[in-house]
């Protein structure tokens, strides 16, 4: 099974890359994590936010293919670590690859949210893009540590 973090944005600061690598390298081969960067669409020539979101959504869906699609959205479902671990167990049992999508500066287009298998909210707060990548990487590792009864997560 492969986990893809599909993220609109590129040229992240070194600390983001370093932190994400720290967590993704801890993941076992059978749950490999790949970070796919989608170049943000520019708001040039009078493009509004919806047009930008729509163009980005098309590229995101191409990158995700037939994966189980998780869209990170502030209006999505908030879960505990144990609930996330249960979700991850389900993903593992299904055998499908999973794409987790982080939107760009304008967020995700409604069409992508409707196609998502799950809308997940890491927080109701607005966070910097790089911070979301790091938090997502850490939470995926934490969820797997719960599944494997590893002492990283403590209740």
Swiss-Prot record:
Subcellular location: Cytoplasm
Database matches in HAMAP family: 23SrRNA_methyltr_H
Binding positions (S-adenosyl-L-methionine): 72, 103, 122-127
SUPFAM superfamilies listed in its UniProt record: alpha/beta knot
Family note: Belongs to the RNA methyltransferase RlmH family.
Subunit (UniProt): Homodimer.
Catalytic activity entry: pseudouridine(1915) in 23S rRNA + S-adenosyl-L-methionine = N(3)-methylpseudouridine(1915) in 23S rRNA + S-adenosyl-L-homocysteine + H(+)
Annotated GO CC locations: cytoplasm
EC number(s) per entry: 2.1.1.177
InterPro entries linked to this entry: Alpha/beta_knot_MTases, RlmH-like, tRNA_m1G_MTases_N
Main subcellular localisation: cytoplasm
Protein's name according to its UniProt entry: Ribosomal RNA large subunit methyltransferase H
Any one GO molecular-function label of the UniProt entry: rRNA (pseudouridine-N3-)-methyltransferase activity
UniProt KW Transcription regulation keyword: no
Keywords: Cytoplasm, Methyltransferase, rRNA processing, S-adenosyl-L-methionine, Transferase
Enzyme class name: transferase
Originating species: Methylobacillus flagellatus (strain ATCC 51484 / DSM 6875 / VKM B-1610 / KT)
The protein's role, per its UniProt record: Specifically methylates the pseudouridine at position 1915 (m3Psi1915) in 23S rRNA.
